[in-house]
Amino acid sequence: MELRDIEIFLMLAEELHFGRTAERLRVSQARVSQAIRKQERRIGAALFERTSRTVRLTDVGRQLRDDLQPVYAGLHDSLERARLAARGVTGRLRVGMMPFNLADLHFYWKEFRSRYPQWELEVRQMVYTDPFGRLRNGELDVLVVWLPVEEPDFTVGPVMLTDPRIVAVTADHELAQRTSVRLEMFADFLHTMPPDVPDYWEDGYLPFHTPRGRTIERGRPVTNAEELINQVGMGEIIHGFPSHVTRHWGMPNIRWIPVPDLATLSYALVWRTDAENEPIRALADTVRELGTFRF
């Protein structure tokens, strides 16, 4: 099996979506389909169950994923260490971002790189699916994520960003002409959240109940930002966001309305306690010294 085909298989096993797999790997969907069919012919069994709406791993696919992941990770790490050594770089810090405003936070990355040129800093935008899992499996070293985070194996570091809340609705929505929206009104409309996240963490972003105890209903879960904003644009849901997204999504059919009684989001550095190292501590110190960015 060629290395690229292994990458395609593992990415599809993670995303369970041919389009997103192609997008993340910067290949065509046809290339993804071709690679999977080739692997299935070679193995003699289906690796994925495909319908018009879902993609799921078969038992054989799950076994292959579990066997290949550590092998691929080890090979990738070996090649990466050799690449860094050739450039005189002694280490790498991989940071995953849940907020969208990478540019607003550039001064943190710039300062870190200036102070620590011996370490490569890699900052990437995260998809919604299982962000904590990416810390636990070693894909990331640090996650910038909204609080609270109450995972026993994680350390919560300094707060990098605080941001007031807004709600997104379509331009023809009954709330669209309001100057503000109360959290109590959320119970009258459908919302959504990522799948398979801890209840306390979801509640920290979008409460399950209004101040008067009414349920805030969730529809089908979403796995990425494009899917989320498309559901809003189609009028299927309304959704609470941090206010910084208005600088990155200029959509004429979407209205952004302040929600003054929805708690401000605080985003902090989070890392695995047993994986803490010098670059992680250095980034945390840099953020503490520069202070919290308040949107």
Model-derived features: positions:
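N-terminal short secondary-structure element
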Residues: M1-A35
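N-terminal winged-helix
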Residues: Q29-A30, Q34, A73, D77-E80, ...
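A short LG(V/I)-centered, amphipathic sequence patch enriched
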Residues: E40-L57
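Short beta-strand-centered segments that line the small-molecule binding cleft or hinge
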Residues: A85, F107-E111, R115, T129-V169, ...
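C-terminal effector-binding regulatory domain of bacterial HTH transcription factors
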Residues: A86, I229-N230, M234, S243-N253, ...
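Hydrophobic hinge/microswitch elements
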Residues: V127-L140, W146, P194-I257
